[in-house]
């Protein structure tokens, strides 16, 4: 029977340290409840002595969260421990996590103490924390650079004092998997009372090895892994919990352990953390990145369509995503194009695959990714691989300031005529969008707005990528200009042209259907 690896989440403590602005109590509670749904065993939610705001956050979460154990951090200082206990006492059960540097470098240059002093401080603090709870974790800060003899001594002393979890952090991400696994093995072999506590690991990603170090530690006997959602954390970040969790699930036959995580909540939790923390997830991020389950190569797409296991070691559904994503690009094959048309409900008799694929390749070479509405337009109304511009931005002006509501005037070329409108909004971009929407009158909802810089200095361009929802369907648009408001307006106009084209497709399909009925 496999053993459980306890998942200890520190997104709201160690992860928050990476953010430019502190999270509100409400935002922290949102994340805590999401972590609870996901099934984390322990959540470290703050450092109560650090500020009144952190104290209030810890107390609020301790009151609201019922199915995960709430934990707070404290230095090996009496006041820290007492304040942590006060913040947590409203919870039915809680953990106090005390930490103290143990490496020679930290002891001499930071603490300016002797190792014997550190040993005594660790024992005293663990005992003090045990006065409040029987769940006490002790962390040997910078354990990765602590001499193994000293590490064994402090671990043994902390367990004797009452620590039920011993955490071995690679605080600066210095160790390699072979080295870190060796540290855990040495502890099991040399600490006589090691069986009285759970060994935990907390790895940072400075050399990009936090997940590998954590998995190696599990193989060596560690039974708790600490980390954050999306790898949030200081410097290069923490061990990415979703990666460790899925590695344990996917490689269960090798690791022989399991977690109690609800895997289908992983993606939703990741997206929530990204949104609240304003930390975008890189597209190539393992498990939760937008490309993690995307296939662009024609060979890969064909292989996935024949058997998903050809190129997928886990399913998107296993983390809460709905389906495989086949990105249609110039590298896509005929099978992928045909599959996408079938998914949209078209049969072979509805279009000519040869001519569609030829037109698709030419369009993909020009624009990169081709979307569903592009395919339909190529199949039914536009064989020239050009995106027709029914709408074109002719002119816009904006007035805004700190004490006035933003107002925009817009002129839009609509086919053969020019229409103009004015509107107010919550900022200049919103005002321009409101004015354009008054002209076109399409029911749309902005789903995504992303601004990125192209180039540097005064010649830099602002690229705006947006996604809107129109009658349950997603449409994409891109705008590029030196002025952010202008690039935003161009992106929306691009979207509107895509929507207009989709409407033309529907009209053409209706016309063809009517002609077929008349022929019958």
From Swiss-Prot:
Signal peptide start and end residues: none
Cofactor(s) needed for function: Mn(2+)
Disulfide topology: none
Transmembrane portions of the chain: none
EC code(s) of this entry: 2.3.3.13
Keywords noted in UniProt: Amino-acid biosynthesis, Branched-chain amino acid biosynthesis, Cytoplasm, Leucine biosynthesis, Manganese, Metal-binding, Transferase
Main location: cytoplasm
Region of interest: Regulatory domain: 392-520
Alphabetical list of InterPro entries matching this protein: 2-IPM_HCS-like, 2-isopropylmalate_synth_dimer, AIPM/Hcit_synth_CS, Aldolase_TIM, LeuA/HCS_post-cat, LeuA_allosteric_dom_sf, LeuA_bact_synth, PYR_CT
HAMAP family on file: LeuA_type1
Family recorded in the similarity comment: Belongs to the alpha-IPM synthase/homocitrate synthase family. LeuA type 1 subfamily.
Full protein name: 2-isopropylmalate synthase
Organism: Yersinia pestis
Taxonomic path: Bacteria, Pseudomonadati, Pseudomonadota, Gammaproteobacteria, Enterobacterales
Gene from which the chain derives: leuA
């Amino acid at each position: 029977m496999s053993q459980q690896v306890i998942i200890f989440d520190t997104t709201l403590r160690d992860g928050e340290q990476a953010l430019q602005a502190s999270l509100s109590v409400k935002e922290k509670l949102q994340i805590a409840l999401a972590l609870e749904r996901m099934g984390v065993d322990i959540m470290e939610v703050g450092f109560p002595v650090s500020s009144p705001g952190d104290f209030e956050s810890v107390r609020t979460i301790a009151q609201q969260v019922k199915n995960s154990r709430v934990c707070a951090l404290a230095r090996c200082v009496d006041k820290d421990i007492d304040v942590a206990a006060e913040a947590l006492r409203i919870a039915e059960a809680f953990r106090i996590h005390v930490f103290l540097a143990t490496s020679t470098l930290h002891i001499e240059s930071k603490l300016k103490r002797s190792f014997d002093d550190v040993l005594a401080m660790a024992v005293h603090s663990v005992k003090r924390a045990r006065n409040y709870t029987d769940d006490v974790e002790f962390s040997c800060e910078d354990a990765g650079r602590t001499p193994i003899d000293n590490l064994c001594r402090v671990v043994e002393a902390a367990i004797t004092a009452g620590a039920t979890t011993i955490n071995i952090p690679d605080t600066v991400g210095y160790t390699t998997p072979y080295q870190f696994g060796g540290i855990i093995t040495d502890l099991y072999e040399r600490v006589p009372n090691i069986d009285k506590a759970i060994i935990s690991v907390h790895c940072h990603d400075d050399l990009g090895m936090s997940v590998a170090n954590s998995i190696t530690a599990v193989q060596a006997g560690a039974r708790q892994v600490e980390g954050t959602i999306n790898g949030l954390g200081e410097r290069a970040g923490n061990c990415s919990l979703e990666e460790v969790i899925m590695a344990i699930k996917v490689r269960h036959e090798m690791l022989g352990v399991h977690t109690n995580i609800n895997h289908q909540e992983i993606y939703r939790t990741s997206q929530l953390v990204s949104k609240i923390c304003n930390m975008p997830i890189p597209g190539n991020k393992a498990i939760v990145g937008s490309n993690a389950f995307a296939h662009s190569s024609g060979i890969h797409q064909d292989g996935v369509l024949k058997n998903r296991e050809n190129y997928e070691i886990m399913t998107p559904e296993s983390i809460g995503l709905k389906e495989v994503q086949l990105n249609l690009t110039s590298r896509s094959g005929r099978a992928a194009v045909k599959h996408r048309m079938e998914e949209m409900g078209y049969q072979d008799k509805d279009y000519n695959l040869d001519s569609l694929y030829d037109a698709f390749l030419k369009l993909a070479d020009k624009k990169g990714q081709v979307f569903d509405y592009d395919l339909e337009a190529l199949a039914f109304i536009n064989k020239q691989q050009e995106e027709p511009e029914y709408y074109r931005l002719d002119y816009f002006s904006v007035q805004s300031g700190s004490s006035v509501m933003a107002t925009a005037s817009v002129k839009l070329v609509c086919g053969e005529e020019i229409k103009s409108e004015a509107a107010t909004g919550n900022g200049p971009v919103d005002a321009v969008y409101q004015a354009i929407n008054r002209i076109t009158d399409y029911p749309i909802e902005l789903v995504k707005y992303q601004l990125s810089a192209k180039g540097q200095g005064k010649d830099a361009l602002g690229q705006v990528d947006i996604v809107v929802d129109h009658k349950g369907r997603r449409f994409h648009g891109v705008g590029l200009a030196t002025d952010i408001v202008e690039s935003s307006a161009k992106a929306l106009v691009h979207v509107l042209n895509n929507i207009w084209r989709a409407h033309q497709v529907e009209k053409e399909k209706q016309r063809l259907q009517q002609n077929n009925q008349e022929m019958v």
